[in-house]
Amino acid sequence: IYLCRYQQTSKFDSMKRQFILTCICLLFTFVGTQGKTTSIPTIYIDGNGVMRWSDTHREASFFGANYTTPFAHAYRALGYLGVDRKAAIDKDVYHLSRLGFNAYRIHLWDVELTDGEGNLSENDHLDLMDYLIAKLKERNIHIVITAQTNFGNGYPERNEPTGGFSYKYDKCSMHSEPEAIAAQERYLYSLVRHTNPYTGLAYKDDPSIVGFEINNEPCHSGTKEEVKAYINRMLKAIRKAGNRKPVFYNVSHNEWTVEAYYDTDIKGTTYQWYPIGLVSGQTQQGNFLPYVDRYDISFADKVKGFDKKARMIYEFDPADIMYSYMY
């Protein structure tokens, strides 16, 4: 763009005009830099339950790991060793990338992120989570956040009192107690809107965050209508926060109420997969590749709308063998 033209008349005029020109050039450089954004495609779920990229509309598929350094025992263990947690995150994310992972999932320990009313706490756990997200973004690793666990932070040690709302309720009453539901609404609303200081983006606006799962392995004890009402209240709180990302729900627990899950507006469903079992108590021998050839879901042909939801395995582990080939 042709901005200006000037003719030198005196040394003073020349210096003045040169200064003005310099300011104009700097201004346009600054504006150009600030206005430049890297377009990162987001994820949407089509009418057939397939995750797709927003730019190419091709299917999006992911393989990754759970990793919990910001929370609970992993957090404490690094403290015992005197290890800088952010330095550990730097190294671990590097190795996750070397493994070829393009995805990361975590269930947040809400007991370490909230007060007794469900208000989000600005603390070291949240700061480390924000830092971890920023480092994952640098490696082009996409993220699914499971917002809450609704159990303590102790295992394999004793729980530590934190004042978090989940400590006030039994896990199986979390989804029916009015005060507990209100606390979860408050927490989800604040979490989704939380701005990560390392990225400058709210979780709801970060394209590297694929979506949110409402909770980890819920324990529903009520009727199907009560289960549906609970999920709809959580969805409403997340929408109110401005979220447009897909929301997932665990459908591999409480299978007797599975119809209620699919009768809500969740966009994705989550499952465990231990292809050769979990508790044999010994190392099993043999060729187990046929066990990962298929993943059969018992209610796949029984529930209306099953094929309209995306599917995510949040735990995959051939736990009773010592071989790596199952991956």
Give the residues covered by each predicted segment.
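Active-site mouth of glycoside hydrolases
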Residues: I40-I266
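Glycoside hydrolase catalytic-domain groove-lining segments
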Residues: K240, R244-D320
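Short, Lys/Arg-enriched N-terminal segments with co-localized hydrophobic residues
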Residues: I1-S14
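Aromatic- and carboxylate-lined catalytic core of secreted/periplasmic carbohydrate-active enzymes
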Residues: Y327
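Bacterial N-terminal signal peptides
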Residues: T22-T29
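Boundary at the C-terminal end of the N-terminal hydrophobic targeting segment
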Residues: T33-T37
